[in-house]
Amino acid sequence: SSPNLNPHYEMIDAQLTTEIFGLYSPLNPEYALLMSSLPIRTVARENAEWISQFYIIMHSLSYFDKDEIQIKDKIFSMANEARKILPDASYSAKMYDFVKEKYQSGVPWEAARDSLHKRYQISQEDNYFWSTKDESCNGCFAAGINFGASLISLFYGEGDFKETIKIASLCGWDSDNPASTWGGLLGFIYGKEEIKKLFNEQMSDTYNIHRT
């Protein structure tokens, strides 16, 4: 994952396989980060590494009594705690603060999404250059822009399972990944029986996958 050897060191890959370490370490994010350190560093450095750690911390903190605290309040508390892993000067930290400010301003999520696109994909602010560095798809698989998009769905979804994954899917870029990240996290928080009630139908207990 060294930037000198791997031009893809800030793509989204690491978060897809390391979030689960947070669930392996209930309420102990420090140990979760220790367990996940090597798996992250096989493919990610710098912002992609910090973003992966953000998601791991979120998952580690997802153990709580839903009768004692509202899911929305807990989600925001978890996010604020995970924000501390992002160096303040990094573009990932600035993306977090930018999206949170948009949410707090009351603008619709669609407007926040367009503002994110303009600031980072078009204007390339905060030293975010993947939209031009990656000529294959303007950085559509980059950890950064997908992190920003995932925060839009996290904040505007406000802990609502369906709304969160809807917004995540509609934000674009590599949108199946933020949707699966928050779908997995909220699914764990709500539990299987509650998810079944949300969709009011029998859920499959098997999943078949193949590679072409």
Where are these regions (language model features)?
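Accessory "access/gating" subregions that flank catalytic or transport cores
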Residues: 1-9, 18-27, 37-42, 56-172
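Hydrophobic, membrane-interfacing alpha helices
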Residues: 12, 48-50
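Long, well-ordered alpha-helical segments
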Residues: 25-34, 190
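Short sequence/structural elements of tandem HEAT/ARM alpha-solenoid repeats
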Residues: 30-35, 72-73, 197-201
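Catalytic phosphate/nucleotide-handling subdomain of diverse soluble enzymes
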Residues: 44-47, 54-56, 60, 149-212
